[in-house]
């Protein structure tokens, strides 16, 4: 039955207005309902106190208000980072992370259940892709975390489970809802979307001319090493991926971030650092060096701190911004 109900949390204002009118209500009700969903973040129709009980029943008969169920919260003793496990209405579970900074609260959300990209160092892809998340399921991760901590979320990164550009249309609707001034109203400049390098989608996103930051999971300085770490590189050459990043900057004026997980003995040599700086030479970019997270299903290990320092120093010497 749920499949036949309309997912109104995924609707923009125009669609919601059309839907409410089709149910026999007046246009102004749509604005009230949109506010209940996207400003007050209610979890049920019954919480909409200025809507008549009669029309609430009509809504229940025709629509569903997607609401994630908080299954578990793990809090880091080191820095207070909170990892959330949310249950979806089909029984699948997704992860989100809250990071608290001096400049505000940042949430990292998932865009899919599982992932089909197969990156060798990533645990999220071990069981493949189950499905893409709806816009409502993406944005409700932010709403639920905001309610849990009782504070405003100011920054969002789409870097959790899944390849965001593999769920492209839902991602765009999520961005529209997230940045709507009638909703939670998070600035496009405070949103980062990651990709493993789906070149046609990167170029398509560039043409949307949004003010969001694009983060490319690069993780290697040449094509052969990237193919060994990331199966997506069999479809897209590393130079085509970097060219797509240059195109993104040309279209949007937004500096691209390169994510580079340092894997001990695999991609962390001085030669790798030299190749990396040559690869992105002349670009207005940011390089984020990340010691890889070991997972039991793979035998990759972190680079030691001395090796990381060498990579960082080399990139700085070549006027490429590295971040540790």
Where are these regions (language model features)?
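Conserved alpha-helical substructure of the radical SAM core
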Residues: 125-155
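Flexible, acidic/Gly-rich N-terminal and inter-domain linker regions that tether
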Residues: 1-105
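Canonical Radical SAM [4Fe-4S] cluster-binding loop centered on the CxxxCxxC motif
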Residues: 100-137
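Alpha-helix N-cap recognition
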Residues: 41-44, 222, 320
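Conserved AdoMet/S-adenosylmethionine-binding subsite of the radical SAM
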Residues: 146-155, 160-311
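Conserved small/polar residues in nucleotide/adenosyl-binding loops
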Residues: 313-320
